[in-house]
Every structure is written in C-alpha cells, then in structure tokens.
C-alpha cells in the first residue's frame, strides 16, 4: 500500500517538473509558484451572453417576459429615439406586454453630469430591468444607471476608477441589462466598462467591474446599414485599436499587484491566451472588411462582419485591457476645442472616441515595438505589410507605417493638429493622460511624462 502511494507521489512530482507546452505556460506566459507573488498568476474571462442575427432585436420583449420583468428602463439618445433600432425594441416590448419608460437624453461622449442625470431617472423609476439601444455612450450610461440605482446610497465617486474615484468593488446585485449596439466599435455590449468625461479635470475616467457587464448583448447587424460613413470609420478604428492594444498589452502574469482576493482582480488584466485569440480574429476582420464597410453602405457582408468584430474585440480587450492609445485618447477627447466631426449630429464640439484613439496609434506602436516585436510584426502582416525583408528591430516602425497607410486610405484627419491641437497643448494632454493608469500601466513598455509628451508631439501630424 505504501509502495503504491509512494509511486503516485513520485509520478505527481515528475508531472510537476514536466515542461508544459500549452500557450498559457510557454514563453510569455510562463509562471512561477503562487507563493509570495508580487505579480498576478491567474486571469479570468468575464463576457456577456451574446446573441447574433439579423433582426434578432425582435426577440427582446420575449427575453424580458421570460425573466418576469414588469418595469423596464429603455435608454437611448435623441438622434436614435425616432429611428428603426429603437422602434424595433419598443415594438417588441409592446407586443409582449412589457411596461417601460424611455430615457432618450443620453449624451454622446457622456460626462459625470449626464451619468448622474440618467442615474436619477433610474432611481425614481424603480425599474427591474434595463435596455440600452445605441452606441457605447448609451450602453455605458445605462450600466452606470443600473449600478447606482441598485446601490442608491453610494457616492458617485465610490465606484469610479482611481485616482479620480475610490474604485470600490461592486458587491450589490444589479438588475438584468440587455444591450442592443447600433455602432460597430466600442464592444460595450460585452464588457464591464463604463467611460465618461469627468468635467472638473477635463479628463476621461470610468467604472470598471465585471458586475456591470450586460446580461445579454443582442447583436443585430441590420442596425448598421444606416450608419453614416465617418461613424463607420471611427467606430471601426476603435475595433482596430482594441485588437492591437489588447494583443500587445503587458502579459497578465507581469501585471502587479497580485490581488489578495479575486474580487479585486481588475477587469483589465493584461494579454492572455484567450483574449489573444479574439484580438487577432477581430484584427483580421478589420483588415478585410473595414474599408469596404466605410466606402459602400450597401455592402452588407462588410457591415455585418464589422458589427460582429466589435464584439469579438470586446471579448478580448474587455479582459486583457488596452494601453497607451486609449489612455492618451481621453484627454484628446476631453480637451476638444472647436472640432466637429462630420456625420455626428451633436450640439457640442466632438472628437469621436475611435478617432481620438487611432490618431496616436502610429507613434504608440513605434514606441512599444521593442518590447514584443513578434506581436507587432504579426499585427502588421495581418494589416497587409510585406515582411519578407523585415528586421525584428524595426517591428514598431513597420506596424506604424502600415497603420499610416491604412488611415490615409480611409481619409483620416492628418494628426492632432487637424483636430485643433498645437504643441502648446501637449502639457495639458500629458496631464490628462496621467490619471489613466488603469490602462497605461498595461503598456508593454514603461513610459515617463517626457516620453508621453514626445508621443503627442509625434502624433501632431500623421502623413
């Protein structure tokens, strides 16, 4: 009996010493024993349920009925409130006998004030479910309304990311939330992230918690057919950068600190083997279909593919995270002066989120290419680069040049100068980036304030 036990113990020890060949434990993702760690040793995937199909929006009333819902808050913005996506949702609710109230005052690029207005509406309504119909602004606003109406005694900054907020863990149960995205970019229907402008500091921040992710995302590609050209382009740039940044992010087991409790493990954990798969797949779709989707509104194959790619990238970055392009984008959007983007019906100056992200991408990936050059080269090749004579030391420059050509072909504004910024704005842009440590710390290459300033300077002109 003892001999048998000794044999089992010997076998277990041999297995522990064996070299594991799976992606999670080879090269980038190799792990040390989990004793006294300063960096994390685990990652987890938190994703909303997703249902995809043309005209699948018609099922939303049945879902709410199946859940026993009695009083629903439907959130959208004024531009969408009279259009077919919202009409399809409301028709389904009426058909299935669901009581609802419509909130159509969501602000495109929401602020803390617009969040609080929506939260107050939700608190007064005593809703038992939420529906968000729109782009990332609508879905993020609805997430916040669900959270704070479910935790009515919380201060607004309790759940906001540090250093602006307290970053408390969400421990209260939330109501079901169905997201119906009408753009192909943010991936917000799959993530536990809600982004807004904190007006006092003129900086973007947000709430990041798996608890606020939608219960269900209804991915209905029919809603993409009426998207204007620049909305398609700018939302597609968000998919592009979600994919690139999550794939090149600091690996999850190099991120610190190691949480003492799994509830404290951040939503943005660093690149990992599962997120990598979704990021690369989304990037391939962008490479194949984004230009077609922008140039031809009747190209159903391209527009439908990009709508799904947004969710694919959301699965990836919603767990791996993003880094410098997004971190630097927040002050670009927050400090906007007079720029008004084409095809956006808003009453205020606006640098659309996807545009604010992609304008720094050539400079950023030139900078990060030294740290994971193989991944930068792989991304460049997916986007069309010829690597036959490529040198690994040039990985960042190759990806940057590939991105410049891609953006030029899609008539993207020629850098930050084209959207109203000058060299004198760089200190404010750097200052606005510093609070974004939640994402910037996932850059594969550490950076100083001087290096951030150099990246903004390099992004003033693209071509």
UniProtKB/Swiss-Prot annotation:
Entry GO CC: mitochondrion
Main function: Catalyzes the cofactor-independent reversible oxidation of gamma-hydroxybutyrate (GHB) to succinic semialdehyde (SSA) coupled to reduction of 2-ketoglutarate (2-KG) to D-2-hydroxyglutarate (D-2-HG). L-3-hydroxybutyrate (L-3-OHB) is also a substrate for HOT when using 2-KG as hydrogen acceptor, resulting in the formation of D-2-HG.
Molecular function in Gene Ontology: alcohol dehydrogenase (NAD+) activity; hydroxyacid-oxoacid transhydrogenase activity; metal ion binding
Protein name: Hydroxyacid-oxoacid transhydrogenase, mitochondrial
Pfam families: ADH_Fe_C, Fe-ADH
Catalytic reaction(s) noted: (S)-3-hydroxybutanoate + 2-oxoglutarate = (R)-2-hydroxyglutarate + acetoacetate; 4-hydroxybutanoate + 2-oxoglutarate = (R)-2-hydroxyglutarate + succinate semialdehyde
Highest rank taxon of the organism: Eukaryota
EC number: 1.1.99.24
Species whose genome carries this gene: Xenopus laevis (African clawed frog)
Species lineage: Eukaryota, Metazoa, Chordata, Craniata, Vertebrata
